[in-house]
Amino acid sequence: MKHLSIFGSTGSIGQQTLKIVRSLPHLFNVVALASYGNNKDLFIEQIREFSPSIVSVYDEQLYFEIRKEFPEIQAFLREEGLMAAATAEEIDMVVAASSGVVALPAIIEAMKSGKVLALANKEVLVSAGEIIKEFAKQYQTEIFPVDSEHNALYQCLEGRNALEVKKLLLTASGGPLLHKTKEELAHVTVQDVLKHPIWHMGAKITVDSSTLVNKGLEIIEAYWLFGLENAEIDAVIHPQSLIHGMVEFLDGTVLSVMNPPNMLFPIQHVLTTPKRYPAPHKGINFSIKQTLEFFPIDEERFPSIGLARQVLKNKGSSGPFFNAANEVLVQRFLAEEIAWCDILDKLTRLMENYRVFACTSLEDVLAVDEEARALAQEI
């Protein structure tokens, strides 16, 4: 039985993780739950159903409610709670399903404590990939990617000779604005952007999907996850989202992972690896006609891919700056302060004017994160 700690349990990935736990109850024990959002009722329901021994919240009122209703549970606030949920002795695996870098210090402590890391938080690797890799090497941390694309690449690469890999290829659905003209893009609304044709995700990642910043972040994430210095990392539009990642080898052979666009597939793989179990979710129906399409990404229309490549070239502080600046610009778009087109325009300007420096500590990362947020709020 695996003993789990779940960061971001009320978010999309957190809820789906608990769905897998619910479907395979003999395999898992939920030791800790951490919530950053405002979904108090859902979090209380999760506590009642899964009976964790540790909970962490950011809302002070909810903290006192939990202490009153569940006196037997160790309840914590904010950073102290994340640390407890990351390092408790009985925990085997930490599922990092939160967004942003708020959980970064706790994730590092989990690695130091010898936990297996199920990483669904791409911002952590984008902002602190070099630091995470150093800690993973030092503490021999197993890191399993939960993102569907990186999970697919992981499965394709497992047991393979890294020197034989030519290219890692991530797929992108193209997002909700794939077929919009340049003129139409100038007038898209928040409601337009949040209507994703394939995936049901949180607002921030749905906006990132529309700008393809999400794919840029994933290119950076793939670099730090797999460390294949000689392999090219690229992305391609695949509207059906049935193939999630591909690995091309030196002989031209391509391996891919296929499943319906449902995060339950990669989540179950990570939670149950190295074994496989019957799933409550259905696979691809090959008895009906299926179409697989692939298109190159128009990098002039979507400069996010080029910006991501620049981040990988510069490394250092460019990763946390890129991530934090984009996050604020997305928040401003969702608040209807700026237009959709402004996200990439302003992000490009911020990146062009930013002077990169070596980023060697957690404190450096958090300082850059704070600076980028301030600049992105002002531009």
Swiss-Prot record:
GO terms for molecular function: 1-deoxy-D-xylulose-5-phosphate reductoisomerase activity; manganese ion binding; NADPH binding. GO terms for biological process: isopentenyl diphosphate biosynthetic process, methylerythritol 4-phosphate pathway involved in terpenoid biosynthetic process. Pathway: Isoprenoid biosynthesis; isopentenyl diphosphate biosynthesis via DXP pathway; isopentenyl diphosphate from 1-deoxy-D-xylulose 5-phosphate: step 1/6. Its EC number is 1.1.1.267. It catalyses: 2-C-methyl-D-erythritol 4-phosphate + NADP(+) = 1-deoxy-D-xylulose 5-phosphate + NADPH + H(+). It holds the Pfam family DXP_reductoisom. 1-deoxy-D-xylulose 5-phosphate binds at residues 122, 148-149, 173, 196, 209, 214-215, 218. This is 1-deoxy-D-xylulose 5-phosphate reductoisomerase. It comes from Chlamydia felis (strain Fe/C-56). The gene is dxr.
